[in-house]
Amino acid sequence: MKFLSFKHNDRTSYGVKVKREDAVWDLPMVFAEFGDKDFNPKTLIAGLQQNQTLDFQEQVRKAVVAAEESGRDEEFKLLFTDIDFLPPVTPPNNVIAFGRNYEDHASELNHEVDSLYVFTKAASSLTGDEATIPNHKDITEQLDYEGELGIVIGKSGEKIPRGLALDYIYGYTIINDITDRTAQSSHDQAFLSKSLTGACPMGPYIVTKDELPAPENVNIVTKVNNEIRQDGNTGEMILKIDELIEKISKYVALHPGDIIATGTPAGVGAGLQPPQFLQPGDEVKVTIDNIGTLTTYISKN
């Protein structure tokens, strides 16, 4: 399943992509009409939280099938052209990112890879697919892109052993870890350089892990104005997904909806010769196999 959150006519909602259609089932409406008893989570985060005790996907499947068989299915669908995409989840807790997890990317920026490099991004930096974000020209001339695979946590845990780590994953998404290289080079920590408004585009979907059975062998392609800048594969990650979860959960309790960005391959603007940073009016597309394409526009003004 592909889950998404959206805004329609000033109403915020969430849903699941209609198969073979550019449309979404509006799940709160579907659940209200066809759901089991009082099961009607109002947000995707609430659905993930309830998934710890109840099979959320099964509840979705049964309700959608009932809607399809009712003959009134069009009442519960919205076309993508009629909605604004939001971040699939807005975590109440953590947006955690791993840096220097691709050796070629670390090398292009002359960074060491012999130690764990972890940082957080402010939840206020999150934005959805097709969003236009500030160009931040008032503070930097070095705004950069980083296409990444994102892990979405599905159940609570800490000190999770590597052998059980994959059980804590609900699904995967796409993240563009937009970075202010000026701030990054002038501060010892990464939080400020990674947390500008709009600096964490995410989406367009959360793809459930059953639909991405080999997340460590998917291509990541980032294009700026249709020019390929990054062309990597998650198989190149230094620390694999189960290792990332084991290492971070040793210190940080994870909860449903928490996001872990797994690092970016080579090809960022700062690593090119000469460097090529994002400019007003640019279009950035990050595509990951079997998830989709995350599009971000840099404001002209």
UniProtKB/Swiss-Prot annotation:
Keywords recorded for this protein, A-Z: Metal-binding
GO molecular function, one term: metal ion binding
Positions that bind a divalent metal cation: E146, E148, D177
UniProt record similarity statement: Belongs to the FAH family.
PANTHER family: ACYLPYRUVASE, ACYLPYRUVASE FAHD1, MITOCHONDRIAL
Protein name in the entry: Uncharacterized protein SERP0556
